[in-house]
Regions:
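Amphipathic alpha-helical coiled-coil segments
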Residues: 91-95
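Short, linear, compositionally biased motifs with a strong N-terminal bias
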Residues: 10-13
């Protein structure tokens, strides 16, 4: 049951980036939309296009732990990745706390990583489960 709950949480996180249909958001929600989560979701929306551009260039990829990683030195990539990862961490931690899943934070991160990998465009850099970076 927890794996289903965690998967649905990941769907909500992806929806928060504004790229999933509304019906996906209705399956599961945060118990309380905290100011920190609202700010994190807004930050993710604001940097989405810039992050996508860095991913398209291969400068940033999606790792296997639910975060982005700088793969090639590029002006601004590190600051952008750091901001994105900070916001993701806020969201993951809040969802885990509100749903009594703090012991499963790493699982939430990995499920979200899989969602991000599934959503990645062809040509995007993703890290597989054994740590190798591959092109989708």
């Amino acid at each position: 049951m927890n794996k289903i709950k965690i998967f649905l949480i990941a769907v909500i996180l992806a929806a928060g980036a504004g790229r999933l249909p509304v019906f996906a958001e209705a399956k599961y929600s945060l118990k309380e939309m905290t100011p920190a989560v609202e700010a994190a979701l807004e930050g993710r929306r604001e940097r989405f296009d810039e992050l996508t551009a860095f991913k398209d260039k291969g400068a940033i990829g999606e790792n296997n732990r639910g975060y982005v990683e700088v793969l090639a030195p590029d002006s601004g990539a590190k600051a952008l990745a750091d901001a994105e990862n900070k916001d993701r961490a806020v969201i993951y931690k809040t969802i885990a706390e509100q749903n009594g899943l703090t012991a499963e934070l790493e699982t939430i991160e990995k499920v979200f990583a899989q969602v991000q990998h599934d959503k990645a465009k062809p040509g995007a850099k993703i890290q597989n489960d054994d740590g190798q970076w591959v092109t989708k």
